């Protein structure tokens, strides 16, 4: 599909809201003289799954799932007046003038592999429901960028000139147990516990140029981090009658930094994992067609990973 993901300034939005700046080709004065036809993004995934659901007895059930996903994609774009050294290209001379910037076409690619499995044993009794389970997943992706074409370039340019490459790997495993027990008629206690371990490894070069380095170069990626998380949750639910319910809960949630938290944060301290304590209490009312409820909560974050942009 053709790119359409850049925003518009207020003036353009008011006067020409259908204008799409993606793929614009500019002359030396910055005037748009055309658009690049192959300003596209492409991605495909192939999914494989193997599922087993086995009823072992009236009370016990076994679930197993294996999965594998193969993915590949890229986006190609025309870039105006780009600094050549940022793409591993040597400035060139023409008519006695050194050319350090030129228009070019670049292609950024990703090749990914994701596989793993999950399982659970589920028990259902008169007053007790319980489950134990877990999962293990492995993800590997290769990011790289190529220069497809450079305007009026007089230096050496190999076909599909590669200017960055990095390989990321993530291993993610967990085990858990959870119960729901009817303490009294209409009063249920529920709890679950999860232990999760994961490891990140990213090696290679990022696609961002570090002008603060001496000499300047592509930002290196050398990340090897592991995390261990314990995520418990407990609560109580009280069905007062057919119309009124009360509930309260406490939970702990931990979250690892994402790939972008690492690659976009190379000039600052390494990102840390996020931890949240969640306290909730609520009430619901239901009668006929009418439903109403109130939920009070307090989330206590440490090292919150906040989205920006």
Where are each of the predicted segments found?
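Outer membrane beta-barrel strand-and-loop segments of large Gram-negative receptors
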Residues: 96-120, 270-272, 278-280, 285-309
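Outer-membrane beta-barrel transmembrane strands
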Residues: 34-77, 104-126, 164-188, 224-231, ...
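Feature marks flexible
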Residues: 83-106, 111, 145-162, 245, ...
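Structural signature of Gram-negative outer-membrane beta-barrels, strongest in the C-terminal barrel
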Residues: 135-137, 163-301
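A structural preference for short, pocket-lining loop segments at secondary-structure junctions
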Residues: 129-133
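Flexible, surface-exposed loop regions and adjacent strand-edge segments
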Residues: 2-19, 78-89, 143-156, 205-216, ...
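Extracytoplasmic loops and strand-loop junctions of Gram-negative outer membrane beta-barrel proteins
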Residues: 27-37, 45-47, 97-106, 113-114, ...
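Acidic/polar loop-and-plug regions of large Gram-negative outer-membrane beta-barrel proteins
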Residues: 1-49, 77-104
């Amino acid at each position: 599909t053709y790119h359409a993901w850049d925003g518009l300034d207020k003036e353009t939005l008011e006067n020409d809201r259908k204008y799409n700046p993606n793929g614009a080709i500019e002359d030396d004065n910055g005037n748009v003289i055309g658009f690049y036809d192959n300003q596209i993004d492409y991605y495909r995934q192939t999914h494989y799954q193997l599922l087993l659901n086995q009823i072992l007895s009236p009370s016990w059930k076994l679930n197993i799932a294996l999965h594998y996903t193969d993915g590949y994609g890229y986006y190609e774009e025309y870039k105006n007046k780009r600094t050549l050294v940022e793409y591993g290209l040597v400035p060139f001379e023409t008519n006695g003038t050194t050319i350090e910037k030129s228009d070019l076409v670049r292609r950024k690619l990703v090749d990914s592999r994701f596989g793993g499995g999950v399982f659970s044993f589920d028990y259902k009794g008169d007053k007790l429901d319980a489950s134990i389970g877990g999962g293990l997943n492995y993800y590997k992706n290769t990011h790289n960028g190529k220069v497809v074409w450079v305007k009026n370039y007089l230096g050496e340019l190999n076909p599909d000139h590669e200017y960055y490459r990095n390989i990321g790997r993530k291993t993610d495993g967990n085990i858990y147990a959870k119960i729901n027990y009817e303490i009294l008629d209409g009063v249920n206690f529920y709890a679950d516990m999860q232990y999760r371990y994961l490891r990140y490894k990213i090696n290679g070069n990022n696609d961002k140029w570090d002008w603060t380095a001496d000499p300047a170069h592509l930002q290196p990626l050398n990340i090897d981090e592991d995390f261990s998380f314990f995520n418990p949750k407990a609560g109580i639910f009280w069905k007062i009658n057919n119309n009124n319910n009360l509930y309260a809960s406490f939970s702990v949630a931990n979250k690892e930094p994402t790939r972008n938290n690492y690659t976009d944060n190379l000039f600052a301290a390494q990102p840390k994992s996020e931890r949240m304590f969640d306290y909730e209490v609520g009430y619901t009312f239901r009668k006929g067609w009418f439903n109403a409820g109130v939920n009070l909560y307090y989330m206590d974050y440490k090292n919150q990973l906040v989205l920006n942009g």
